[in-house]
Amino acid sequence: MDLLKELESLVPELERGLDQASSLTELEELRVAFLGRKGRLAQIMGRLPELSPEDRPRLGQAANGVKMALTERFEGRKTALEAASEAAALSRFDPTLPGRAPWRGSLHPDTLVMEEICSVFRGLGYDIVTGPEVEMDHYNFEALNMPAEHPARDMQDTLYVTESILMRTHTSPLQVRTMLARKPPVAIIAPGKVYRRDSDITHTPMFHQIEGLMVDKGVSMADLRGTLTSFLRNVFGGDTRVRFRPSFFPFTEPSAEVDISCCICGGKGHVGNEPCRVCKTTGWVEILGCGMVDPAVFTAVGYDPEEYTGFAFGLGVERVAMLKYGIGDLRMFFENDVRFLSQFS
């Protein structure tokens, strides 16, 4: 049977071709020639109708066996050529050389300071609250005892979206929102971004603040002093000295500015024989503002100022980071300079 002989000759013929194939391209050409849709095996199978009905099953069975043999030999040669190609590629460099570990980033100093502050206040039983950065004028000013045309609004260069919508200038609106949603006692801190129309070595249009609020029956200025002293010594060290100075904020009465002994000179006013550039030789640096919540704020949120008292405070995260890490220029926090940021890894 001529067709059977042609079929049986395909295997040794392919083997000779495989021995001569030196690349995957030549191997693919062989596959198409023998196993392709118009290849040698397909041509032989196309002549099956020429055979008698008795011979067709035998030739079909033989064709299946030949196809399996051709495929097996082809795959074997393909594996060998792929291994040779990979070995040739590897020969161009030394795979035993030690690898280079991927570069790892680090947390931003703002993030480090915010996490540390939040951790301290969590330990004191405070909740962490967040809210919208695009805020209503009512929550940002009016409910905080700063009605329209109040001169205290001039203390903050506000970015307005519309006449009644603005970019929040502090996170105090979250204190109002929380008091409207909860009944006393309330103990929260509100970290987040705030916005003001200002930009220089000590100011940026966007920065981070953390503001706190405690409301309950019998809360006093002594509680405020004790809380903030404990917090500041947790962040800046147990030897840190803390002092309170009278001040003014429209939503607290009485109000105070809080200073700490200078982190750079240790409160001495000088470093060696040089005057301290941070505290300007005073030995003190301003760190935050605070006070007892004004009764007008309680009235605005539906609290009875005759029954409840509370204190509030606020501080800039970048301010804390600058003092804690000795950073001289606020703008460095926002320039994404890896040389600066990698120091905090």
Curated annotation (Swiss-Prot):
GO molecular function, one term: phenylalanine-tRNA ligase activity
Recorded catalytic activity of this chain's protein: tRNA(Phe) + L-phenylalanine + ATP = L-phenylalanyl-tRNA(Phe) + AMP + diphosphate + H(+)
Protein's cellular compartments: Cytoplasm
Needed cofactors: Mg(2+)
GO biological process: phenylalanyl-tRNA aminoacylation
Cofactor: binding details: Binds 2 magnesium ions per tetramer.
Keyword hit for Endoplasmic reticulum: no
Keyword line: Aminoacyl-tRNA synthetase, ATP-binding, Cytoplasm, Ligase, Magnesium, Metal-binding, Nucleotide-binding, Protein biosynthesis
Broad class of where this protein is predominantly found: cytoplasm
InterPro entries, per the entry: aa-tRNA-synth_II, aa-tRNA-synth_II/BPL/LPL, Phe-tRNA-synth_IIc_asu, Phe-tRNA_ligase_II_N, Phe_tRNA_ligase_alpha1_bac, Phenylalanyl-tRNA_Synthase, tRNA-bd_arm
Residues annotated as binding Mg(2+): 253
Disulfide bonds: none
EC numbers: 6.1.1.20
CC per GO annotation: cytoplasm
SUPFAM superfamilies: Class II aaRS and biotin synthetases, tRNA-binding arm
HAMAP family the UniProt entry points to: Phe_tRNA_synth_alpha1 (MF_00281)
UniProt xrefs under NCBIfam families: pheS
Assembly: Tetramer of two alpha and two beta subunits.
Family: Belongs to the class-II aminoacyl-tRNA synthetase family. Phe-tRNA synthetase alpha subunit type 1 subfamily.
Protein name: Phenylalanine--tRNA ligase alpha subunit
Source organism of the structure: Nitratidesulfovibrio vulgaris (strain DSM 19637 / Miyazaki F)
